[in-house]
Amino acid sequence: YFRDLPRADCSPAEALYILQGNYQGFTQYDIGKVFSSTILNLSLKKIIKIEEIPDGGKNDSKITILPQDTNSVSLNSDEIIILNFLITACKNKSKSIFGGSKESDNPNEITMKELKKYISNNSSKVVSLKSAIDKAIKSKLTSNRILDLKGIKRRNANMAGCSIGVF
């Protein structure tokens, strides 16, 4: 529910982090949800455009990074991290996926098929992306006094003590 979120400008990653209550960072399953929902949020903010394109009888989606006035839209740090990942994927898709650039390649566009291939071929960049998002979210939420690191440490210590007592 929207009313459960702490702020109107809360990013999808912040919302998931708060609502899950697991302050150790995102799991590998969570990062896919965060990535997808942030892409949709960037589309709503008109930072990117998502459109369906035909792909040999199947439908694919194309993400286009739109030109921006640097002062027009405010993005959260985790949204900037994911946008930069998309920009890098767009620029490097032809080199890493097809072995060379094509003349028709637009450095501001990538299909979902190309993005999935880029992600699967660059697992270390995905690990770095997850780490950067975890750090950005924790920093933003603690600086806004939504999370208290001391309280989280106490909670984790109590949880560890409980699990040791159970075994």
Model-derived segments and spans:
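Short, amphipathic alpha-helical interface elements at domain boundaries
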Residues: Y1-A160
